[in-house]
């Protein structure tokens, strides 16, 4: 690669990345920087014991073409980037689709949500997603689907058939 080609690649890469507080990045190569908005959000990760959620406030960047709900779930998949907290979701989990209708957020995840285990109690991964999304204010409940199917249960203990609401009992006090 010539220096000019390297500069072009570097410029293209830098143009597409917006740095977020905790040194994680959102790849947004199709958007001009003028369309980026910032918002503080509550993300719920696991405590070190894996039995409670811990709130982490982060500033996230998102574009008008990428929903804030999508950014939140993608950040949860990336993990906390903080040694005092643990991830709640498998790192290879894919968010297949996400939408909001009448205050309900519909989250469609890949099957690794059910098959890949993280070292936390059963309600932690589910309520990490639910509590983080419900904290936005415009979402009253979350419906989790696996490959489009909602007739599933998580670790045989939490039914995903119903809309789930914010759960304060799983938050560390």
Residue ranges and their predicted role:
Residues 1-173:
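Bimodal "functional hotspot" detector
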């Amino acid at each position: 690669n010539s220096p000019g080609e390297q500069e072009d690649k570097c410029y293209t890469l830098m143009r597409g990345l917006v740095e977020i507080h905790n040194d994680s990045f959102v790849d947004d190569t199709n958007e001009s920087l003028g369309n980026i908005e910032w918002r503080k959000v509550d993300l719920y990760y696991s405590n070190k014991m894996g039995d409670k959620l811990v709130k982490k406030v982060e500033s996230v960047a998102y574009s008008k073409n990428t929903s804030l709900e999508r950014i939140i779930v993608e950040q949860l998949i990336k993990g906390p980037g903080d040694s005092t907290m643990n991830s709640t979701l498998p790192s290879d989990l894919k968010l297949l689709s996400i939408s909001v209708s009448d205050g309900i957020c519909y989250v469609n995840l890949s099957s690794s949500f059910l098959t890949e285990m993280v070292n936390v109690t059963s309600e932690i991964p589910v309520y990490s997603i639910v509590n983080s999304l419900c904290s936005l204010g415009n979402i009253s409940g979350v419906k989790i689907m696996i490959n489009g199917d909602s007739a599933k249960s998580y670790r045989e203990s939490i039914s995903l058939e119903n809309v789930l609401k914010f759960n304060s009992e799983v938050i560390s006090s």
